[in-house]
């Protein structure tokens, strides 16, 4: 009997020692970003410090929309940060997202949020034209503010546009003109723009570079980026497109394959919190507006003025994106 008691006590001691040696697993978040490196790191570092979570960052590679979605499907990410409304719409259609409504999403105007929780809208911008002032002066032109002004004879072979397949401001040009003017007038405009022989780049950064060095005169870019470039370089000038613009939304979504869903939800809640709202302006991003502050941002209203912005039909702009681009490129 004594041996049995000793055996039991020894076993209990070993079990207790084993339990005591177990260390809590560090909190982690696997983040895939479509944003630039610097901005992604600002967001990730801020959340990491606030929540005590290690954020592992990957970046979504280039390619077609389907190639990018396939990449997200094949890898086990918790959150996809920086996608566009069209991209999230298609990702949800292909069942690679999981639903979550961030705690303070109700404070966002209805037209700027996904009310069923497939993704969380975070930031908004508009379409801008970034011009090289030296080139404009040489051509005797004012900085363009409308799409029709890009048809000036002096601007033939002087336009830089990111490839439409990448979405963003360049694809927004197509959909805004199409929705505001109707298909017939949009195709007529597309034919005239195609005759201007714009150069198509692999990203809006490359388009900006061409304008910066003076090889091209005007680039179509997001407003927040255009304003940053204008502030840094005296020979660049940003204008908001007045006649057919677009509210360009970027956000975040939780992946269906998330290994850390609790951390993913906490991350989205943080980005929608007051701390998340102030994060970008506190780090110098003054022209990328948070959707939660949209109704109160007088600076945004003063900056964009009276622009005409359609309400996007995502079931059209997303599902038929390839066909829309094909027709635009083929307009003669």
Kindly label every feature range from the protein language model.
Residues 15-18:
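C-terminal motif of bacterial Sec signal peptides marking the signal peptidase cleavage site
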Residues 20-90:
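Early extracytoplasmic/lumenal segment of secretory-pathway proteins
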